[in-house]
Structure formats: C-alpha cells, structure tokens
C-alpha cells in the first residue's frame, strides 16, 4: 500500500509503516513515496 509519506530511502518508511501495519510491516521507497 502506498502511504502519503515522502521518502528518499526505505529506512524512512519503516516507522510509519510499522505504526500503521504493525511491527512485521515491510517498507519500500518508490517514486519518493513510501510503500508498505
């Protein structure tokens, strides 16, 4: 799921993804937006 969080690296996406989807969430940075 793409969430409305800007990013330059996947590390920036982990905290918001974990917050929404729980601690087992994975995260990627695609086109400047986080994808969980």
Curated annotation (Swiss-Prot):
Annotated S-S bridges: 7-29, 13-34, 17-36
Subcellular location field: Secreted
Domain-related comment: Has the structural arrangement of an alpha-helix connected to a beta-sheet by disulfide bonds (CSalpha/beta).
Taxonomy of the source species: Eukaryota, Metazoa, Ecdysozoa, Arthropoda, Chelicerata
Role played: Inhibitor of voltage-gated potassium channels (Kv). This protein is capable of displacing the binding of radio-labeled noxiustoxin (AC P08815) to rat brain synaptosomes with high affinity (about 100 pM). It is also capable of inhibiting transient potassium-currents (resembling I(A)-type currents), in cultured rat cerebellar granule cells. About 50% of the peak currents are reduced by application of a 1.5 uM solution of this toxin. Is lethal to mice (when less than 100 ug are injected).
Record-given protein name: Potassium channel toxin alpha-KTx 2.7
Annotated InterPro entries: Scorpion_toxin-like_sf, Scorpion_toxinS_K_inh
Similarity remark: Belongs to the short scorpion toxin superfamily. Potassium channel inhibitor family. Alpha-KTx 02 subfamily.
Domain of life of the native organism: Eukaryota
SUPFAM superfamilies: Scorpion toxin-like
Gene Ontology CC: extracellular region
GO molecular function: ion channel inhibitor activity; potassium channel regulator activity; toxin activity
Organism: Centruroides limpidus
UniProt site (Basic residue of the functional dyad): 28
């Amino acid at each position: 799921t793409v969430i409305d969080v800007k990013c330059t690296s996947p590390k920036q996406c982990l905290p918001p993804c974990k917050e929404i989807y729980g601690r087992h969430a994975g995260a990627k940075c695609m086109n400047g937006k986080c994808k969980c």
